[in-house]
A protein has these predicted regions:
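N-terminal export/targeting and maturation segments
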Residues: 30-78, 86
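Edge beta-strand at a domain terminus
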Residues: 165-207
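Amphipathic hydrophobic-ligand
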Residues: 71-75, 131, 189-194
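Sec-dependent bacterial lipoprotein signal peptides
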Residues: 1-19
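Bacterial Sec-dependent N-terminal signal peptides
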Residues: 18-52, 196-207
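Predominantly extracellular/secreted and cell-surface proteins with exposed
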Residues: 75-162
Length: 207
């Protein structure tokens, strides 16, 4: 009798397990799993740094860099990662308008591939030599999908696979640009980077 009860219980468990894994309806059609989506929001502060090695025209180049900052010169940013169970993650960056501190310009960050660190980036302190990616910056409201800028980007993470206390570096080597702008000047190097420093966030919002 005990043997029969054990076999009956085992049979019930097998049936329940099969039903739990079965994604078909009464007609035998396979029902795809419900797609799941979520987003995580991380707040950063932004600071622009640059190094100009051009003895005769350094001040003019520095003034030009200050007059044309990346992402509109914002000091506050929101980095958003949108995840979908059936799609690749979508990375977005919102630059808070410095004039009203409320509205924001949104950009999609498209990874264009891995790149090597450029020698001129060594002029910065804390410049990594590994884990660089080229990113195209595309405005959210664009109609043609064309990037407005391209940066060499790397992220420094104190905690692996976590944005807590992380820093993001958006770097650009502008040496050739300013050599063309000032062809008669001796310009050795012009590099600039936007440094995003972690403030708060990391919460996951299910959509």
């Amino acid at each position: 009798m005990k043997y029969f009860v054990k076999k009956s219980v085992l049979l019930v468990l097998v049936v329940l397990a099969f039903c739990a894994c079965d994604n078909s309806n009464d007609n035998g059609d396979v029902i795809p799993p419900n797609p799941q989506s979520s987003k995580s929001v991380v707040n950063y502060t932004g600071e622009v740094e640059f190094v100009v090695d051009a003895p005769q025209i350094r001040e003019d180049i520095e003034q030009d860099l200050k007059a044309n900052p990346p992402f509109g010169g914002s000091k506050k940013y929101q980095f958003i990662i949108k995840r979908h169970s059936t799609l690749s993650p979508l990375y977005m960056l919102y630059a808070v308008n410095p004039e009203d501190d409320k509205s924001a310009d949104g950009y999609t960050l498209n990874i264009a591939g891995k790149v090597e660190s450029k020698d001129n980036y060594r002029l910065f302190s804390a410049a990594s030599v590994h884990g660089w990616y080229k990113m195209d910056i595309v405005p959210v409201d664009t109609k043609d999908g064309k990037p407005v800028a391209t940066y060499d980007v790397f992220m420094h993470q104190n905690i692996p696979s976590s944005t807590v206390d992380s820093k993001m570096y958006f770097c650009e080597d502008l040496t050739e640009k300013y050599r063309q702008k000032f062809p008669n000047e001796d310009i050795h190097a012009v590099v600039r980077r936007l440094v995003l420093s972690y403030v708060s966030g990391g919460d996951i919002i299910n959509e």
